[in-house]
């Protein structure tokens, strides 16, 4: 909190302005000397209002004269003065920032920005101004093609710690930091910086553009890492955005990507639940081919990959997710084949406790050696339990039990059997009683 002024210097400052010579290069030094002496008196008297006017007058004097070197020197000097009033210094920085759009010489502009960043470094009361100056300097470096310097300048600014920074502007700043990391293909740091943003912020209606920008960057990171489940979730978040729902063409495109990445995600409980929720969306009716494909993965029935490729191949390959002649697209197409085979193995495991390798290969449309290799990979990843007897070429999907487990299962089966016998006994007794009653009535 600023101190109350001991003396009001506003009238004296008005008199000083009248006494100063016209603003020209000859009189600048004399005028500046008078102003600096007066500024010290005002500052020591804690007259914030007049002090602010004096500081701005000094800056204007040098700016109009085109003495940018003198302006830079005075800014540094004024900030080092003992007992400077925070409100006055904040106003000075804000005022000098208004000069920047009118400076045509790029070197002069950069020097002034650097000076302002230097004097605001570590000062909480001008942290917002420093952040904006940093962003401006970064933009200049980026326009010059120096992406590395632009990224280093912008990303070294810890805006997440700036309490006085407007939250919307803060999020936009962080997203700009992430964008520069992505331009340099630094996906690890880009992912780290996105974690500084709380996604609950995007629940507000007036930040939908920032939400779309955020998830666009998250999708790029997820695609680079082949994190299909994460990418699917990001697309669902975009799909649920009001501005996307208002555009039929847009939400159809996004929903198509949601389905594609849900199918690419390796099977687990979360993926299964996600597929069922997607299938329950009535808007999926507008994509009948993908709706059929989703149902193929939900029902407990075998799918033949050659048939899947024949029916859905042209539609899927036209999507950028499975684009032909693209390394990532070809990889995802191969991954989709794996998901189909994994689904088929789970179906087989539900119906068979033991099966011959050659028979499983026929069901999966794979050679015995390829079947064995694929099965070994899935077992190693703990997708399900299976044991291969190589000499006999038999695969067992039933997990072997120890003595205790066998005893527990036997006990459970006996209990279930006795329960059923008791129910049958009761039904027989009931039937006998009904029969005896009918005979008694007949007599």
From Swiss-Prot:
Keywords: Nucleus, Phosphoprotein, Proteasome. The keyword Transcription does not apply. Its main location: nucleus. It holds the Pfam family PSMD12-CSN4_N. It is found in: Nucleus. One of its GO terms (biological process) is proteasome-mediated ubiquitin-dependent protein catabolic process. GO terms for cellular component: cytoplasm; cytosol; nuclear envelope; nuclear periphery; nucleus; proteasome complex; proteasome regulatory particle, lid subcomplex. This is 26S proteasome regulatory subunit rpn501. The lineage of its organism: Eukaryota, Fungi, Dikarya, Ascomycota, Taphrinomycotina.
